[in-house]
């Protein structure tokens, strides 16, 4: 984790409670001194997740407007969907995670279900 102080990490959050968990992780890592960015490719649906996102924005955590670069040497935290996923996953998002996993530039850690994996299969 010490290398992440220099290279940073990106928390990719989803529209529901799993995304809120990701925002909390981003907050806690930021408060411990890590370089943290957050990217949310969805419209947030859950009130609590909206509140968490608002709070981390007020702390000065970088909110990315575009997808993170898979070639950068940073850790990605996948907080997109949880066990109760009911919607299909965007194929562009799956491809982005696949690109990252093929590089030797950082890692992906999923806090629940890895993006692209069907929780019902």
What are these regions (language model features)?
Residues 1-3:
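Conserved alpha-helix/loop element of class I SAM-dependent methyltransferases that forms part
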Residues 5-121:
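Glycine-rich phosphate/dinucleotide-binding loop and adjoining beta-alpha-beta core of small-molecule
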């Amino acid at each position: 984790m010490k290398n992440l102080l220099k290279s940073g990490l990106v928390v990719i959050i989803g529209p529901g409670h799993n995304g809120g968990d990701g925002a909390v992780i981003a907050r806690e890592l930021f408060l411990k001194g890590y370089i943290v960015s957050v990217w949310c490719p969805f419209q947030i649906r859950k009130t609590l997740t909206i509140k968490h996102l608002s709070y981390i924005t007020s702390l000065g955590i970088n909110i990315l407007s575009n997808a993170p670069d898979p070639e950068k040497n940073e850790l990605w935290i996948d907080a997109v969907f949880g066990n109760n996923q009911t919607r299909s996953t965007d194929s562009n998002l799956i491809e982005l995670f696949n690109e990252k996993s093929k590089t030797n530039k950082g890692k992906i850690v999923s806090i629940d279900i890895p993006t692209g994996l069907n929780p019902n299969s």
